[in-house]
């Protein structure tokens, strides 16, 4: 699998990276402000988990390290945020694992359709050797894996009507993450998959660019997509989780003790979800 970038995406990413750099305040003394991003709203569980990391980090270091969270896609789409982290323009980002599939193939296993049976099954995998190897795999391409968050099962929702059988998916234009796994799955089911970033889904539903999408129930509610797409079908076709990653360059600029502290807090933040 390979990453493909369009000129417009590259230019957008550069612009956002410059904007993120401008957001960094001048640091006085030994203090350092880390930046974290998320496309979800302020009270979404992953945003609260990362905010908790910041609170603990500041307390543990007596204010020497602090963390500011930019939520609601303030610094762009997930793909933009991944690129910004890789190049050190931001420090930490929480992204859906499907957005990482094409660049970090180890993440693919967690999103394979109907492979993971339940939340308990997922936790057994990501809390063990599988999760460790996935987090270790980010270092090869400019990131450090910090934690894996359970985001719940993913199901299909749409504007046209209830899905009672797999045949009801035929011809539906469904938004999917930019992942080959999800494109192939929906094509196999007869749907017409349309890759869009999370922030584009509401307007795409509103303008009928798409008929529906697939996601977890928390994202469905927090983004208020239920106001347009009123038919939720409990397909539970994937338990693909969210992953917290950090810029490798910026991580390595921390002391060994601070690196260990940040890793430990990230792991503890899983329970905050």
Give the location of each predicted region.
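N-terminal secretory/targeting leader peptides
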Residues: 2-5, 9-121, 129-130, 136-273
């Amino acid at each position: 699998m390979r990453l493909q970038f369009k000129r417009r995406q590259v230019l957008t990413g550069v612009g956002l990276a410059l904007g993120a750099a401008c957001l960094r305040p001048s640091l006085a003394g030994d203090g350092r402000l880390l930046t974290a991003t998320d496309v979800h709203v302020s009270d979404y569980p992953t945003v609260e988990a990362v905010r908790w990391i910041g609170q603990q980090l500041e307390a543990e270091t007596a204010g020497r390290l602090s963390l500011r969270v930019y939520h609601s896609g303030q610094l762009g789409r997930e793909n933009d945020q991944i690129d910004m982290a890789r190049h050190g323009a931001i420090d930490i980002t929480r992204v859906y694992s499907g957005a990482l599939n094409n660049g970090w193939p180890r993440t693919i296993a967690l999103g394979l359709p109907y492979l993971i049976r339940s939340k308990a099954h997922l936790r057994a995998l990501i809390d063990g050797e599988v999760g460790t190897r996935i987090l270790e795999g980010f270092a090869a391409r400019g990131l450090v894996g910090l934690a894996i968050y359970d985001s719940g099962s993913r199901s299909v929702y749409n504007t046209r009507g209830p899905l009672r059988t797999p045949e009801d998916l035929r011809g539906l234009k469904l938004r999917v993450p930019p992942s080959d796994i999800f494109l192939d799955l929906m094509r196999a089911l007869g749907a017409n998959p349309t890759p869009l970033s999370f922030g584009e889904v509401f307007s795409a539903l509103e303008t009928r660019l798409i008929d529906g999408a697939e996601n977890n129930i928390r994202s469905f509610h927090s983004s208020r997509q239920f106001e347009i797409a009123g038919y939720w079908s409990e397909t539970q076709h994937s338990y693909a989780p969210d992953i917290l990653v950090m810029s490798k360059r910026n991580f390595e600029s921390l002391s060994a003790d601070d690196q260990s502290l940040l890793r430990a807090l990230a792991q503890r933040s899983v329970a905050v979800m």
